[in-house]
Amino acid sequence: SKKLKVLMSGGGTGGHIFPAVAIAQEIQKRFPDAEFLFMGANGKMEMEKVPQAGFKIEGLNIAGFDRGNLLANVNLPFKVISSLLKARKIIKEFQPDFAVGTGGFASGPALFIAARMGIPTFIQEQNSLPGKTNIFNAKKAKKVFTAYPNMEKFFHGTKTLFLGNPIRKNIITDIIDSDINKEKLGLEKGKLTILSVGG
């Protein structure tokens, strides 16, 4: 039988990368023979984090719009064109069954080209205020999975499905083994532990 092939794209920050990894891990759990290919931005953290999670990644020479330094955007149109062409070549060779985008500028060309090539695309939005890339790609997406309810106004209504944020398997394991983790931190087992984060 034919192997399931999945294209994943998202990056720039951990907020885009780690949900993509979590989705890939869950698909892998359900379809152990599935093949994955991530598409990210060269020089960004996904180029390191995705291989660490055990997945293959291809880099695009893409960057976001720099609002602070307008001169830095001079090469942006060329970067977009070269990224679209490279994304097309990668997708043509890999031939995914579907593509999942989690936002960040790298997922723009990847999902745009996938949709143009007739490949079903899906979006996962982690934020209550969606990013521009996900809003743009949602127009052609089959479904948009959101972390928060009532996101229809951003994503053409019927396309949205509120599922919450995906969590990586090592995080779930750490939560289940909370007593072991308390021991590592020198805390007492069985006692309620509160973590306070600010800043």
Q: What function would you assign to each model-found segment?
A:
Residues 1-4, 176-194:
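Nucleotide-sugar donor-binding and catalytic loop/hinge architecture
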Residues 6-11, 30-79, 84:
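Conserved nucleotide-sugar phosphate-binding/catalytic loop shared by glycosyltransferases and other
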Residues 16-27:
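Short amphipathic alpha-helix
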